[in-house]
């Protein structure tokens, strides 16, 4: 499996999160499919494809044998062409299978479609071709991420632009509302990783700036406070974030500033927050808040890339 490349974050903290991160990196070491097919077998598939020049009326699409071949990871020939970044070959395959939605949207063992892999490998041109050929941008991988979730997580503005401009308005509306299996929308992921341009772009497209995580009710503004990102706080306020929206435990973004180092964030929110949502309950102390801000795996940044079970240093 391909994993998004790491993006070092200033907000990374030591402590319990380190243990979570190590466990997550171990769990995420999946085979990418690169080593599951021998070079000779891959070259033979390439040769067979290049020899195919039949018109649709001469043979149905399903009759082409290379479409039926899968690796042990469930990768199709199109998956492999994208993984290996064989762009001319990938475009040729897409051209031949245009309209064959079952093949274009086929998901490997990790539930990744060719569109997911185009985003992971940072090939926005391929992603655009796949969308125009009929790929479904709403399909999710094994973590519940759509391709747009991955693009926001990686901070690839070019892929975000392709995915939001090429899909239909109906698809776009659904994807912007969709949450992955950690309860995060695309806006949440862009906020967590501090990609301000993507945050602003998503809100402009109609993303709900006050969307709450299903598990604890944090909004993007709560996340910005948790991650101590004053620039993100400013942007979210500019985009209409509700400073008085509380989590399911009743905490406003301002209340999360207690015990945090950024006085700038506290000043920003203090001017706008209702008085009764500024002080912590008398029965609470600053340490009791720790249960509110447990980090999910989405908030632990990728810092490695795994190919065939081997970690690469970027």
Swiss-Prot record:
Per its UniProt record, what PANTHER family does this chain match? Answer: NF-KAPPA-B INHIBITOR ALPHA
The organism of origin for this protein: Mus musculus
The sequence motif named Destruction motif is recorded at 30-36
In the record for this protein, the ANK repeats are positioned at 73-103, 110-139, 143-172, 182-211, 216-245
For this chain, the site of the Glycyl lysine isopeptide (Lys-Gly) (interchain with G-Cter in ubiquitin) cross-link is 21-22
**UniProt keyword annotation of Ribonucleoprotein present:** no
Q: Which UniProt keywords apply?
A: ANK repeat, Cytoplasm, Hydroxylation, Isopeptide bond, Nucleus, Phosphoprotein, Repeat, Ubl conjugation
- A single cellular component GO annotation: nucleus
Sites where Phosphothreonine occurs are at 291, 296
Q: What does this protein do?
A: Inhibits the activity of dimeric NF-kappa-B/REL complexes by trapping REL (RELA/p65 and NFKB1/p50) dimers in the cytoplasm by masking their nuclear localization signals. On cellular stimulation by immune and pro-inflammatory responses, becomes phosphorylated promoting ubiquitination and degradation, enabling the dimeric RELA to translocate to the nucleus and activate transcription.
Subcellular location per UniProt equals: Cytoplasm; Nucleus
Task: Indicate which residues form the motif Nuclear import signal.
Answer: 110-120
User: Per the similarity annotation, which family is this?
Assistant: Belongs to the NF-kappa-B inhibitor family.
Where is it expressed, tissue-wise?
Highly expressed in lymph node, thymus followed by liver, brain, muscle, kidney, gastrointestinal and reproductive tract.
> Where along the sequence do coiled-coil regions lie?
none
Where Phosphotyrosine occurs, the residues are 42
Oligomeric form and interacting partners: Interacts with RELA; the interaction requires the nuclear import signal. Part of a 70-90 kDa complex at least consisting of CHUK, IKBKB, NFKBIA, RELA, ELP1 and MAP3K14. Interacts with NKIRAS1 and NKIRAS2. Interacts with RWDD3; the interaction enhances sumoylation. Interacts with PRMT2. Interacts with PRKACA in platelets; this interaction is disrupted by thrombin and collagen. Interacts with MEFV. Interacts with DDRGK1; positively regulates NFKBIA phosphorylation and degradation.
Q: How is it modified after translation?
A: Phosphorylated at Ser-32 and Ser-36 by IKKA/CHUK and IKKB/IKBKB; disables inhibition of NF-kappa-B DNA-binding activity. Phosphorylation at positions 32 and 36 is prerequisite to recognition by the SCF(FBXW11) and SCF(BTRC) complexes, leading to polyubiquitination and subsequent degradation. Polyubiquitinated at Lys-21 and/or Lys-22 following phosphorylation at Ser-32 and Ser-36. Monoubiquitinated at Lys-21 and/or Lys-22 by UBE2D3. Ubiquitin chain elongation is then performed by CDC34 in cooperation with the SCF(FBXW11) E3 ligase complex, building ubiquitin chains from the UBE2D3-primed NFKBIA-linked ubiquitin. The resulting polyubiquitination leads to protein degradation. Also ubiquitinated by the SCF(BTRC) complex following stimulus-dependent phosphorylation at Ser-32 and Ser-36. Deubiquitinated by USP38, leading to NF-kappa-B inhibition.
Q: Where in this protein does the record put region Disordered? A: 1-40
GO terms for MF: identical protein binding; NF-kappaB binding; nuclear localization sequence binding; protein sequestering activity; transcription regulator inhibitor activity; ubiquitin protein ligase binding
Q: Where is the composition biased (Basic and acidic residues)?
A: 15-40
An example Pfam family from this entry, by short name, is: Ank_2
State what protein this is by name. NF-kappa-B inhibitor alpha
Q: Which SUPFAM superfamilies match?
A: Ankyrin repeat
Q: Where is this cross-link: Glycyl lysine isopeptide (Lys-Gly) (interchain with G-Cter in SUMO)?
A: 21
Modified-residue entries ((3S)-3-hydroxyasparagine), positions: 210, 244
